[in-house]
Amino acid sequence: MNQILLFIGLVIILCLTIKPVGKKLPFPTLLIFIALGMLLGVNGPAHIDFSDFALTETVCSTALLFIMFYGGFNTNIDRAKPVSVPAVLLSTLGVVITAGITGAFAHFVLGFDWIDGLLLGSVVASTDAASVFSVLREHNLSLRGGTDSLLEVESGSNDPVAYMFTAVLATLAAGGDINIPALLAKQIILGAGLGLAIGWAAGRLIERAHATAEGAQTIFLFAVAIVAYALPSYLDGNGFLAVYLAGIVLGASDITGKVEMAHFFDTLTEMAEMTIFFLLGLLVTPARLPQMLLPGLALMAFMLFVSRPIAVGVLLAPFKTNPRQVALVSWAGLRGAASVVFSLFAVVAGVPGGHDLFDLVFVIAVSSIVVQGSLLPAVAKKLDMIDAEGDVRRTFNDYRDEDGMSFVKLKVGAGHPFAGRSLADIGSATDMLVVLVLRDGAHPVLPNGDTVIEEGDLLVMAAPTFEERAEVTLREVTVTPHGRLAGQRLRDVPQGKHPFIVVMLKREGQTIIPDGNTLIYAGDEAVIATLAS
């Protein structure tokens, strides 16, 4: 047990350590975790012989439920509304068309029988939310015409549809006898009904129940995601559909702390993605992959250039979509973790040749991420679909700075240039707006242009928020008695090789905004700004 925990802990630390490095590479970071798993696997230097498909399917399905919940919860519905109809068409009928065409290719060209070919088509029919979100965010790809929102909604909502057809076809391929219309109806009705109901009920409870008091809302939401998946699944409904819809309903609700909850699930989802890709890399046997390389690449290329473009072109035609947008949406149909996890379901269900299906889907998913994921920014630029003025973060609910405004306070001391002047005069000297004047011995003043500022006033001012945070690094240091800051006036502090500015001092419970004459004492807490390297 201790060895297992030690291994898990070391792998998590290693993944988190290499993740920032991966963002500088020309391919999606998620590939690193697959490579790490393969290096530790049976054909790698570590020679870990891990072949428990059932355990992997359980762990990966659990991780996938949180990815799908977060995909719904973090979708900005207001931004997604204009593209919701085409996105839903792509995530439903698009899956059916893609699965059918791909299954036909597998049957006529690769020699699969019809059931196995359609099973393969269903497994790889959905676009992968984890991969799509990762590429969009890593490259901050804001796309014209709401294409980013379209891709996010489609990739977040099409996995449940692909899973549903995978479950049906895997049962048939394993020799099971099922009533297909009844099973599909049960999957959809229970999945959609319970997902919407759980999301609605959780939204009502989250502000009222004692379990959600004082910071426990995130844990409450964590439990809701589990229930939203487990209850429909237990009743033979579509748990993935339910958990996604519950996330959509909660994300659209006006609940306190939504941004903080989204940040928690963002971190949790990153861990889930790393877990899935690492386990899949650990589970695969690289020695078996060469025989699947040619059919896997052929299927990936066929989907990229034939089945996906046909599905996208047919379904977006009624909306008179720009051909460049159709081309980009077609290219952005990345296959990834969800497809490989669904292939595990076929293995566990006892489908003949299930291990070969897993290896084949693994090749398709990895090659899709490598080719489509790596080239997506370049393709978007070539098609002139990048919105240079946009910010893809606005399509997510964890985007906080919606009004672009921050509040600052200013103390008007003796000799301050604002003292004795009206706000009408001051307005021409600053881009900030005085929204409140706090004056000793008087009520707060809501000012107008005729308000005269007096010495001793505390002004609350609104200013545009600084957006380019990535270019500046802020750090807090304690001034030591023998450090280069102690005993120096700010203007006399030597800059050295890396210039910096002391933007704030904390001294004995007080906050000081310094100028060149400010004397720095040992024990001060200094907030220092430097240019990011």
Language model regions located:
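Transmembrane helical cores of multi-pass secondary ion antiporters/exchangers
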Residues: 1-389, 402
